[in-house]
A protein has these predicted regions:
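Ser/Thr- (and often Asn-) enriched beta-sheet segments in non-cytosolic proteins
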Residues: 2-4, 18-20, 46
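N-terminal cationic amphipathic segment used for targeting or macromolecule association
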Residues: 24-25, 38
Length: 55
């Protein structure tokens, strides 16, 4: 399944990423391990994860 992950970075940039994982939880785990901006280092976590329609 593909998921769209939307979040704000510490530099106030809005990031939208499309990831393909088996679950929404797995998509969030990918963010936690992101070497560029790990989820744990974000100052204000406003996170949206939604399923991506294949239409």
């Amino acid at each position: 399944m593909k998921y769209i992950i939307t979040y704000w970075t510490n530099g106030d940039a809005l990031v939208r990423r499309v990831v393909e994982t088996e679950s929404m939880d797995a998509a969030i785990e990918l963010l936690k391990e992101d070497p560029q901006e790990p989820l744990a280092q974000l100052k204000d976590v406003r996170l949206l994860v939604e399923e991506k329609n294949e239409n």
